[in-house]
C-alpha cells in the first residue's frame, strides 16, 4: 500500500539526491559496513536460494550489496542485476565489482516501483535495507514477484525497533528529541519503518508472496570513539542528516554534539563503542 504520509514523486526525488550525496561517505566507510553487514548479505543470498547459475535481481542495491555476494555465489554461469535510485551509489558498486573481478553483474539506475523486466526473468531476488525505503513497498514487492519464476524467492532485510538498533536509534531519537520532531506517522518509509516481523513479513505478503518467514540476526559495529561514530553517521546516513538539514548551522552543530554525548553512554572504559544491532530478514515465494 502506497504511503499516505509522503508524496511519492517528491520522496523518491529527495532520496535520489540524498543518496547521491552520501555515496562519498559510503566509499570511505564501506569496509566498516561490509565487516558488520556481511553476515546479513550472506544469509539473504542463502534464504533466496541463490546457487551457481542463478539469475538474481537486487532491488535498491546501493553500493553493491548483497549483489556482489550473490554474484560470487551465482558464478560465471549466473548473473546479477543490481538496481538503485542513486547513480553515484551504483557508480561505486561498479567499481567494487570490477575490483573483485566480477563480470556477471549489470547495474541499472531505477527506483523499485519503476523496474520492468519480462516474466520469469529471475530465479531469486534480494533487497538489503532497500525496498523498505520505497513509498509503496508492497507495490514494489508485487512488481518483483512478477519478474520471478514460479517458486522463486525474494529475501529482504529491515532493521528492528530503535532501542534494538543503537547505530540508528541513538542518533535518530536524540535528534528528534533535541529538535522537537514528532515520530513519523505509521507507514512513512525509512530505515526503521518495518521494525517487527509482522511489518517486514507484511511487505512481502502485501506483494503477493507466500510461505513468508522472518528471522532475526545480530550485527555488531565497532567504533574507536563516540566522535568517530558521529562522523560515521553524518557521512553515511541520509535519513538522519535530513532531520537536521532544515535547521540553522548552530542548531545542527549542537545536535551533533548531543548525538556524540548520547553515543558516549554506550562506550567502554577505553572510549570505544561496540553496538549490537537487530536486523530482520524475511523471505517469501513467488
Describe the residue ranges of each PLM region.
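A short SAM/SAH-binding and catalytic strip from SAM-dependent methyltransferases
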Residues: 123-137, 160
Amino acid at each position: 500500500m502506497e504511503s499516505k504520509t509522503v508524496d511519492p514523486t517528491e520522496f523518491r526525488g529527495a532520496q535520489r539526491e540524498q543518496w547521491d550525496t552520501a555515496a562519498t561517505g559510503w566509499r570511505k566507510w564501506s569496509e566498516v559496513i561490509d565487516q558488520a553487514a556481511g553476515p546479513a548479505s550472506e544469509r539473504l543470498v542463502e534464504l533466496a536460494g541463490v546457487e551457481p547459475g542463478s539469475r538474481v535481481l537486487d532491488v535498491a542495491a546501493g553500493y553493491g550489496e548483497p549483489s556482489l555476494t550473490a554474484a560470487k555465489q551465482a558464478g560465471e554461469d549466473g548473473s546479477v542485476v543490481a538496481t538503485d535510485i542513486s547513480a553515484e551509489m551504483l557508480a561505486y558498486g561498479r567499481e567494487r565489482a570490477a575490483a573483485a573481478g566480477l563480470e556477471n553483474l549489470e547495474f541499472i539506475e531505477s527506483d523499485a516501483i519503476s523496474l520492468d523486466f519480462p516474466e520469469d526473468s529471475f530465479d531469486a531476488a534480494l533487497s538489503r535495507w532497500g525496498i523498505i525505503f520505497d513509498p509503496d513497498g508492497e507495490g514494489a514487492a508485487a512488481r518483483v514477484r512478477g519478474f520471478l519464476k514460479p517458486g522463486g524467492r525474494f529475501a529482504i532485510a529491515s532493521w528492528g525497533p530503535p532501542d534494538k538498533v543503537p547505530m540508528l536509534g541513538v542518533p535518530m531519537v536524540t535528534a528528534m528529541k533535541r529538535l522537537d520532531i514528532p515520530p513519523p506517522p505509521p507507514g512513512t518509509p525509512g530505515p526503521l519503518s518495518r521494525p517487527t516481523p509482522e511489518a517486514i513479513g507484511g511487505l512481502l505478503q502485501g506483494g503477493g508472496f507466500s510461505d513468508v518467514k522472518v528471522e532475526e540476526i545480530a550485527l555488531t559495529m565497532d567504533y574507536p570513539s563516540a566522535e568517530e561514530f558521529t562522523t560515521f553517521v553524518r557521512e553515511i546516513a541520509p535519513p538522519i542528516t535530513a532531520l537536521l538539514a532544515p535547521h540553522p548551522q548552530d542548531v545542527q552543530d549542537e545536535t551533533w554534539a548531543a548525538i556524540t554525548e548520547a553515543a558516549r553512554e554506550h562506550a567502554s572504559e577505553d572510549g570505544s563503542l561496540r553496538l549490537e544491532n537487530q536486523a530482520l530478514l524475511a523471505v517469501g515465494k513467488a
